[in-house]
């Protein structure tokens, strides 16, 4: 069965989960841009030491591919936490061309307005895409192990339930390409921080490979948290792609030993679709 994230003709993967058909949703690859050296070539991160002009040009190129102008993007700081902020058209442009203007202190964004593209950077962490088609809500979260330990996926569901009056049964989620357990070994500190966030009866999303070392399935940990938050299993779509394994396609912070570019995860609704 093909993965839910399939490559477009240009340098990005489209989220093909059916509930996301009314949104512009996907993830860039490492190809098709102007960046050089370890950032070659479609680096989307303004904060990694790459030439800013190259990164902005890369972002403008994606904006053209998507027909979603860069001036309508909203980016956030991404501090490896679990805080989330609702944004509107008044926030458009924040973080799009300058990291200093990114929405501060949060790792998730959501909006109920069309004409806003939520955009976050990734290079192994888990991109989590949310949509409630009946309400016109879209959201995006950055879940590294710290954000997962903080329950960021469930936090998005809780915010939509309590502030937007959306039942978890009306929410659909796509868990995008990220580092898999094949390539992600962690220690006791990490698994101990995740343990309290998981449903008590669920299988653990890790296996011990040697004393104090564990192969962690971060995508599965987030799936379990979404189930615990009330999202139906049939509403959760999970990519099998590993960002570390697919070296020809993705940047990987762990594989590339920290000096590398970033992919961009994005989701939004076009104004003409409302």
Curated annotation (Swiss-Prot):
Entry note: cofactor: Binds 2 zinc ions. One zinc is catalytic and mediates binding to the substrate, while the second is probably structural.
InterPro entries referenced in this protein's UniProt entry, alphabetically: Cu_polyphenol_OxRdtase, Cu_polyphenol_OxRdtase_sf, Cytotoxic_necrot_fac-like_cat
Keywords: Hydrolase, Metal-binding, Transferase, Zinc
Co-factor requirement: Zn(2+)
Sequence positions that bind Zn(2+) 2: 182-183, 242, 245
EC number: 2.4.2.1, 3.5.4.4, 2.4.2.28
Reactions catalysed: adenosine + phosphate = alpha-D-ribose 1-phosphate + adenine; S-methyl-5'-thioadenosine + phosphate = 5-(methylsulfanyl)-alpha-D-ribose 1-phosphate + adenine; inosine + phosphate = alpha-D-ribose 1-phosphate + hypoxanthine; adenosine + H2O + H(+) = inosine + NH4(+)
Signal peptide positions (record): none
Binding-site residues for Zn(2+) 1, renumbered to this chain: 80, 125, 142
Binding positions for inosine per the UniProt entry: 46-47, 262
Disulfide bonds: none
Pfam families (UniProt xref): Cu-oxidase_4
Recorded GO MF terms: adenosine deaminase activity; copper ion binding; purine-nucleoside phosphorylase activity; S-methyl-5-thioadenosine phosphorylase activity
Family: Belongs to the purine nucleoside phosphorylase YfiH/LACC1 family.
Described purpose of this protein according to its UniProt entry: Purine nucleoside enzyme that catalyzes the phosphorolysis of adenosine and inosine nucleosides, yielding D-ribose 1-phosphate and the respective free bases, adenine and hypoxanthine. Also catalyzes the phosphorolysis of S-methyl-5'-thioadenosine into adenine and S-methyl-5-thio-alpha-D-ribose 1-phosphate. Also has adenosine deaminase activity.
Protein name: Purine nucleoside phosphorylase YlmD
Origin species: Geobacillus stearothermophilus (strain DSM 13240 / CIP 106956 / 10)
């Amino acid at each position: 069965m093909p993965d839910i994230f399939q490559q477009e003709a240009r340098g990005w993967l489209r989220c093909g989960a059916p509930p996301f058909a009314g949104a512009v949703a996907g993830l860039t690859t490492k190809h098709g841009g102007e960046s050089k050296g370890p950032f070659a070539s479609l680096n989307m991160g303004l904060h990694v030491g790459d030439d800013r002009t190259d990164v902005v040009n890369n972002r403008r190129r994606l904006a053209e591919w998507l027909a979603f102008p860069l001036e309508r993007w909203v980016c956030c700081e991404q501090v490896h936490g679990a805080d989330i902020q609702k944004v509107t058209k008044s926030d458009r442009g924040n973080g799009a061309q300058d990291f200093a203007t990114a929405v501060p202190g949060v790792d998730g964004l959501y909006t109920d307005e069309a004409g806003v593209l939520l955009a976050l950077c990734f290079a192994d962490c888990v991109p989590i895409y949310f949509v409630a088609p009946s309400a016109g809500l879209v959201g995006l979260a950055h879940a590294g192990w710290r954000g997962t330990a903080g329950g960021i996926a469930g936090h998005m569901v809780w915010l939509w339930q309590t502030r937007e009056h959306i039942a978890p049964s009306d929410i659909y989620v796509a868990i995008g390409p990220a580092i898999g357990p094949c390539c992600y070994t962690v220690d006791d500190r990490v698994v101990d921080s995740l343990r309290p966030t998981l449903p008590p009866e669920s299988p653990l999303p890790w296996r011990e490979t040697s004393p104090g070392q564990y192969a962690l399935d971060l995508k599965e940990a987030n799936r379990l948290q979404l189930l615990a938050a009330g999202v139906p299993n049939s509403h959760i779509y999970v990519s099998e792609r590993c960002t570390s394994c697919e070296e020809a396609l993705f940047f990987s912070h762990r594989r590339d030993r920290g000096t590398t570019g970033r992919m961009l995860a994005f989701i939004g609704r076009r104004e003409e679709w409302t």
